[in-house]
Amino acid sequence: MRSKKMTHGLEKAPHRSLLHALGLTREELARPLVGVVNAANEVVPGHIHLDDIAEAVKAGVRAAGGTPLEFPAIAVCDGLAMNHEGMRFSLPSRELIADSIEIMATAHPFDALVFIPNCDKSVPGMLMAMLRLDVPSVMVSGGPMLAGATLAGRADLITVFEGVGRVQRGDMTEAELDELVEGACPGCGSCAGMFTANSMNCLAETIGLALPGNGTTPAVTAARIRLAKHAGMKVMEMLERNIRPRDIVTEKAVANAVAVDMALGCSTNTVLHLPAVFAEAGLDLTLDIFDKVSRKTPNLCKLSPAGHHHIQDLHAAGGIPAVMAELDRIGLIDRSAMTVTGRTVGENLDALGAKVRDADVIRPVDAPYSPQGGIAILKGSLAPGGAVVKQSAVAPEMMVREAVARVFDSEEAACEAIMGGRIKAGDAIVIRYEGPKGGPGMREMLTPTSAIAGMGLGADVALITDGRFSGGTRGAAIGHVSPEAAEGGPIGLVQEGDRIRIDIPARALDLLVDEDELARRRAAFVPVEKEITSPLLRRYARMVSSAATGARQR
């Protein structure tokens, strides 16, 4: 066993002494040592209950004959970090999470690991660490938050973000917004829609690194505690059978993950996270693969922000197994892919009797919400390296549009213009120098997109950025424009009043300026350089790759 590096042999007597100082007995040290990575904290609503999940995991490990040893991981709440300097640190935290777990699990060689994340960067960060370490592992997340219940109906965090714009527009009073604020997020869990956290938790289940039910079982249920106990027991089986993460994460898992991503209408952040995760297993997931799969995968779900359903509805409708079973009907699921159950995807679906229980929440493949997947990859003169849009959340009027560029070099400047009423129908807001390198940190633009929606401009205004978007964003929000402005990309050459053509069905994003004029602008171009006071962000800006390759650190 791997843990023998610190428990066995004459020369490891000092190590055993330190382990006994933890209160561990000889009998406990003779059993497999299982690291339990717990991202609990009292800051993030999706993580405040993770100690309960960890206790259940440890009970499962002990029941199966192991000795659990818990250690912490950080987690950022993107909602709390939104629209201020803190958002620059959210995406960098993904690599920091992966690196710190690698440090802990190598310095203290556990035989197996159970990972307990929940929110946006903690899930991909832990998946990256899992594949990097490649010891028998299982992930069990904290689960989704329930939707809020208000006098106006169901609500979630995005309802509140958009409420700010509605107040500004005069459609809602501040008193009504205050009521919404207190009711939209009723308790623990990852925010209730198909936002980034739930997208990644659902895809961890799809990939096979988490047990069935991981993506959709609500945080507040006893079923989530039972799932955590099963995860603790299952990791012991993985250890006994020597099934490792890289045995599970193969090209088959990549194909399944992208297909389910498109069927669910997941967050555009999956286009950053999945390539970074799969790269740890030596697999290359490109933008072209995303687009190829999107073109042939029907969009079966319209969960918030694209529609009125929430993750609890997806769970009641059959969850991820039901979505996979539906896609399996048209050959889009590789049933032979291995999972942490110790069985293949096909064996899991058969054992679960996976089927759709609500055809409004999970549409049949022959009557989908749309014939193509939730995410589209655009290319053109404005984004030669690619750009990303959640087409399932775009108003029909904005699928093909020629718009007038309104150019801003920061999110704050754009928000001021939107809230000040200076953005009109037919405008395309261009926010640049918000990419991985230029931000640095590639902030999410949820505040401006929510303001656009709240002010009733969602079917009339586009937002184009080298930054990224929250999974809660809806509308013609085109992000990850590559190359970014800080690297000399064409988005840095756009001027106020330029015309931009958006053609999502044709996968095109073009700046309608002739080549001679662009050449003149390029010759005079000097990228904006920001003063970066944070050592971490300075390192990040030097090391981060393009958004087109997952914003990975080199």
Curated annotation (Swiss-Prot):
Pathway: Amino-acid biosynthesis; L-isoleucine biosynthesis; L-isoleucine from 2-oxobutanoate: step 3/4; Amino-acid biosynthesis; L-valine biosynthesis; L-valine from pyruvate: step 3/4
Cofactor: [2Fe-2S] cluster; Mg(2+)
Record key words, sorted: 2Fe-2S, Amino-acid biosynthesis, Branched-chain amino acid biosynthesis, Iron, Iron-sulfur, Lyase, Magnesium, Metal-binding
Enzyme Commission number, as recorded: 4.2.1.9
Active site annotation, chain numbering: S470
Binding site for Mg(2+): D78, D120, K121, E444
Binding site for [2Fe-2S] cluster: C119, C191
PROSITE patterns noted in UniProt: ILVD_EDD_1, ILVD_EDD_2
GO molecular function list: 2 iron, 2 sulfur cluster binding; dihydroxy-acid dehydratase activity; magnesium ion binding
Gene Ontology annotations for the cellular component aspect, listed alphabetically: cytosol
InterPro entries: Dihydro-acid_dehy_C (IPR042096), DihydroxyA_deHydtase (IPR004404), DiOHA_6PGluconate_deHydtase_CS (IPR020558), ILV_EDD_C (IPR056740), ILV_EDD_N (IPR000581), IlvD/EDD_N (IPR037237)
Recorded catalytic activity of this chain's protein: (2R)-2,3-dihydroxy-3-methylbutanoate = 3-methyl-2-oxobutanoate + H2O; (2R,3R)-2,3-dihydroxy-3-methylpentanoate = (S)-3-methyl-2-oxopentanoate + H2O
Residue numbers carrying N6-carboxylysine: K121
Co-factor note (free text): Binds 1 [2Fe-2S] cluster per subunit. This cluster acts as a Lewis acid cofactor.
SUPFAM superfamilies: IlvD/EDD N-terminal domain-like, LeuD/IlvD-like
Biological process per Gene Ontology, one example term: L-valine biosynthetic process
UniProt cross-references to PANTHER family, sorted A to Z: D-XYLONATE DEHYDRATASE, D-XYLONATE DEHYDRATASE YAGF-RELATED
Protein family membership: Belongs to the IlvD/Edd family.
Function, as annotated: Functions in the biosynthesis of branched-chain amino acids. Catalyzes the dehydration of (2R,3R)-2,3-dihydroxy-3-methylpentanoate (2,3-dihydroxy-3-methylvalerate) into 2-oxo-3-methylpentanoate (2-oxo-3-methylvalerate) and of (2R)-2,3-dihydroxy-3-methylbutanoate (2,3-dihydroxyisovalerate) into 2-oxo-3-methylbutanoate (2-oxoisovalerate), the penultimate precursor to L-isoleucine and L-valine, respectively.
Subunit structure: Homodimer.
Designated name of the protein: Dihydroxy-acid dehydratase
Gene name tied to this protein: ilvD
